[in-house]
Structure formats: structure tokens, C-alpha cells
């Protein structure tokens, strides 16, 4: 991946349950199977580019969606429920009131051949964060996308968790990004456009602020953002990755901790990726999206739990 970024200044009776368990644990292909109950968040049913990234495995990240504009991949997003996706607000810019231009492709691994088990759904409307301004482009860079109809969950289409208030991300925590963005500046992901993944460590917020320092009163890194990546560059998100997830694993659940937002160039030295923090914007999402699932680390027991 190198991830898509805007310019920095702009931017369930028992029989039924038994059948479900068989479907979820079978090693045989289940191409026509769907999960008809609300599944646990952040838990892929199957295990295993971005700049310096590598191919992901089919259904490894079943919450990642492609947001299409006029039928072509434009940005990525993350599935929260059967009707809601979250992404970066800058993916829509001045087209917030033109949802018919966009659609969402779910369950795809290779965009060049998404296959019959993928689902394509229109967008009913887009709701950006109230503090987002497309002219400025970086502050509160988060938007909720309402799908035209409910989707069917399957082993390839599952929701991700949001972090609860117990979650902390100390520097050097290893997390992951994934997307279908360019593999270098000006070099699109080649056919068949296989979803790329990349491990990225969390970067200390004060260090990131210093790297992007623009002078007093002009702080580029704010409390609603977090940084991750490599100071030496070479590996990063790039164009077409915007809106995709920064995912951290807590026990056996994957949490959406950030949204790919911006940076300067792709994989440039001392210019790590900047992400919209879901820790900072979780409450806003919860007020709007019914049924979103939270998980986190409970300090007294070390278990996951919802809140």
C-alpha cells in the first residue's frame, strides 16, 4: 500500500445454532453460506500492497470495503454493522450530497475479480463529522456511510469492533493497515488488485507533532489524530488507501483504532501516516450507529468485553 492521502493542508433454536456452527467451522468452501445472526465483531472466519506491503489472505480482513466512485475504486472503508460503513470524510469532499455517485463493494479480495460472493450496495447518504470541513480536510476526517439496504453477513463480510474506553495504544504497538491503494506514488496496484496489508507501529504523539510542526498555532497533529508507520519511510499507505482501517488486535478481536487520513507523500522519510483516531471519535459514532460493537482490554482481568 502506500495509502491514499489528500494533500496535508487540504487535504439464532438449537438446530439453527448447530447449523451455524457447522458453517463457521467447516474447512470446505461455503460459497453460498451466509451468517444470518449478528456475528461477533473483529473475528475473521479465515486466517491469512500498500507501499512495501504484501498480499493479504482471502477473507483475512472481512470488514474492509471498497468505496467506488462512478464504478471505480476510490477509497476504502470499514463495516460496522449491516447498514453502516465508516471511512474518511475527505473521500467525498464536496460530494457529500451526491451519494448516487458512489457505491460500496463488500467481500472483495481482488478488485479485478471480486467474485460472486461479493456484494455491491448503493449509498443512501453520507454523514461527515460536524467539525469536518472539506476545504481544510484533516481535522475530524471521519464520515459515516448509510447503505441503501442491509447486507448479508458471510465469512467474507463481517463487522469490525470499535475500541472501548479501556483501550490504550502505547508507542511501538504493532497494528495493521490494508487497502487497494497505489504501491508507489503514481503506480497503481496492478491487476488483479489483491488487497494489500502492512504492519505499522504506533508512533509517539509528541514525536509525530514535532515531525509535522508548522509553527505556533499551526499544529498539524491534533488530539483527534494518531500516527503510525516507519520513520525511515519506504512502507506506508498511499493514494486509494484513504478511509481504510488502522487495525489493532486486543486478545482475539480486531479493533478499528484509526482511519487512514493523510500524510505528506507516500512512504517519505520522517513523514509517517496520520490517522483519524476512533478513540477520540467513538462517542460520535455510537450516537448514530445502533448495534456497533465495542471491545477492549479490561485492566482487572485482561479479558475482552463489550461496553
From Swiss-Prot:
Its EC number is 3.4.21.-. GO terms for cellular component: extracellular space. Pfam families: Trypsin. Belongs to the peptidase S1 family. The lineage of its organism: Eukaryota, Metazoa, Chordata, Craniata, Vertebrata. Glycans are attached at residue 70. This is Brain-specific serine protease 4. Keywords: Disulfide bond, Glycoprotein, Hydrolase, Protease, Serine protease, Signal. InterPro entries: Peptidase_S1_PA, Peptidase_S1_PA_chymotrypsin, Peptidase_S1A, Trypsin_dom, TRYPSIN_HIS, TRYPSIN_SER. Residues 1-32 form the signal peptide. The active site is at residues 90, 141, 242. The keyword Glycoprotein applies. The keyword Ion transport does not apply. One of its GO terms (biological process) is proteolysis. It comes from Mus musculus (Mouse). One of its GO terms (molecular function) is peptidase activator activity. Residues 50-290 form the Peptidase S1 domain. Disulfide bonds join 75-91, 175-248, 208-227, 238-266.
Amino acid at each position: 500500500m502506500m495509502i491514499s492521502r489528500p494533500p496535508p493542508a487540504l487535504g439464532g433454536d438449537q438446530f439453527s445454532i448447530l447449523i451455524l456452527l457447522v458453517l463457521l467451522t467447516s474447512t470446505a468452501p461455503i460459497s453460498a453460506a451466509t451468517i444470518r445472526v449478528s456475528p461477533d465483531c473483529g473475528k475473521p472466519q479465515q486466517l491469512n500492497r500498500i507501499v512495501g506491503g504484501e498480499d493479504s489472505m482471502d477473507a483475512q480482513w472481512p470488514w474492509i470495503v471498497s468505496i467506488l466512485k462512478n464504478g471505480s475504486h476510490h477509497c476504502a472503508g470499514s463495516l460496522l454493522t449491516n447498514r453502516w460503513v465508516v471511512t474518511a470524510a475527505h473521500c467525498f469532499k464536496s460530494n457529500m450530497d451526491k451519494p448516487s455517485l458512489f457505491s460500496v463493494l463488500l467481500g472483495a479480495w481482488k478488485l479485478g475479480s471480486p467474485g460472486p460472493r461479493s456484494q455491491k450496495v448503493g449509498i443512501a447518504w453520507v454523514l461527515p463529522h460536524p467539525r469536518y470541513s472539506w476545504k481544510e480536510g484533516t481535522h475530524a476526517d471521519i464520515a459515516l456511510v448509510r447503505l441503501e439496504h442491509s447486507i448479508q453477513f458471510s465469512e467474507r463480510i463481517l463487522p469490525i469492533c470499535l475500541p472501548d474506553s479501556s483501550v490504550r495504544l502505547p508507542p511501538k504497538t504493532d497494528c495493521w493497515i490494508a487497502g487497494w491503494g497505489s504501491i508507489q506514488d503514481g503506480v497503481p496496484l496492478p491487476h488483479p488488485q489483491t488487497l494489500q496489508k502492512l504492519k505499522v507501529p504506533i508512533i509517539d504523539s509528541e514525536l509525530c507533532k514535532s515531525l509535522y510542526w508548522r509553527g505556533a498555532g499551526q499544529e498539524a497533529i491534533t488530539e483527534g489524530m494518531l500516527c503510525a508507520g516507519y520513520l525511515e519511510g519506504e512502507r506506508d499507505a498511499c493514494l486509494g488507501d484513504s478511509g481504510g482501517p488502522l487495525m489493532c488486535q486486543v486478545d482475539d478481536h480486531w479493533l478499528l483504532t484509526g482511519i487512514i487520513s493523510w500524510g505528506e507523500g507516500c512512504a517519505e522519510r520522517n513523514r509517517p501516516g496520520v490517522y483519524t483516531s476512533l478513540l477520540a471519535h467513538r462517542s460520535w459514532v455510537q450516537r448514530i450507529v445502533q448495534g456497533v460493537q465495542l471491545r477492549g482490554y479490561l485492566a482487572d482481568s485482561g479479558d475482552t468485553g463489550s461496553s
